Amino acid sequence: MSGLFITLEGPEGAGKSTNRDYLAARLREHGLDVVLTREPGGTPLAERVRELLLAPSDESMAADTELLLVFAARAQHLAQVIRPALARGAVVLCDRFTDATYAYQGGGRGLSVERIATLEQFVQGGLRPDLTLVFDLPVEVGLARAAARGRLDRFEQEGQAFFEAVRQAYLQRAQRAPQRYSLLDAAQSLEAVQRDIDALLPGIVERCRG
C-alpha cells in the first residue's frame, strides 16, 4: 500500500478542520493509517512560525516575509512529518498546503505565481498532493463564521476584497486541474458537506490500496 497525500483547502470559515477530522475517522474505519496535520504548523518549530504569521501585531509584515515564513515552516513540516508518513504508506490529511500559498500570498497579497512556484520547487521538489478538497463558500458567509469563533487572527482581520481574491485564486486552480481537485460547496449544512465527502470515500480508499 502506498501513501496518499490529501490536502483540504478553502477560505476562512469553510470548515476544513472539522471535515478533515471527519474524513480521517471514515478512513480509519477502513483500517487505514491516517496522519492529521496542518499548515502553517505541524511540528513544534513550524507551530512557532505559525504564531508569528497569525498573531496580530503593530508591525506590518511584508508580503515577502510572510511568503518566506510560510515556506520555512513547510520545509520543516515536510522533513519531520509529511515525507516520513508517506514513506511508511500512511494517508496524510493536511489542513492547508501550497495551494493556500498561491491563494493567500498570490491572490490575496498579489505576489507573483512565478515567485511562489520557485519556492515550491525548492522546498518540495516533485512532491504535490494526490488529492485536494477545496471547500468553497461566499466570502461573507465564511467571514461571519470566522467572527463567530471569537478573536480574529491577522489574516481573518483582512477585508472582503482580500478574501474575494483568495477565493478566486482557489477556484482558478481547481478549474485548471480538475483531476487533482474536488470542489465542495461549504455553504451547505455540515451534514450535506459530509455526504459529499462520503461520495468521494470509495475512490480515496481504492487509491490507498492500489
From Swiss-Prot:
EC numbers, comma separated:
2.7.4.9
Q: Name one GO biological process term.
A: dTDP biosynthetic process
- Can you state which reaction this protein catalyses? dTMP + ATP = dTDP + ADP
Q: What does this protein do?
A: Phosphorylation of dTMP to form dTDP in both de novo and salvage pathways of dTTP synthesis.
The identity of this protein, by name, is: Thymidylate kinase
Q: Which family does it belong to?
A: Belongs to the thymidylate kinase family.
Enzyme group, top EC level? Answer: transferase
What high-level taxonomic lineage is stated for the organism? Bacteria, Pseudomonadati, Pseudomonadota, Gammaproteobacteria, Pseudomonadales
Q: Any idea which GO molecular function terms this record carries?
A: ATP binding; dTMP kinase activity
HAMAP family found in the cross-reference section: Thymidylate_kinase
Can you tell which superkingdom this protein's organism belongs to? Bacteria
The record's GO CC annotations read: cytosol
Which keywords does this Swiss-Prot/TrEMBL entry list?
ATP-binding, Kinase, Nucleotide biosynthesis, Nucleotide-binding, Transferase
A Pfam family annotated for this UniProt entry: Thymidylate_kin
Sites binding ATP sit at G10, P11, E12, G13, A14, G15, K16, S17
Supply the InterPro entries for this chain. P-loop_NTPase (IPR027417), Thymidylate_kin-like_dom (IPR039430), Thymidylate_kinase (IPR018094)
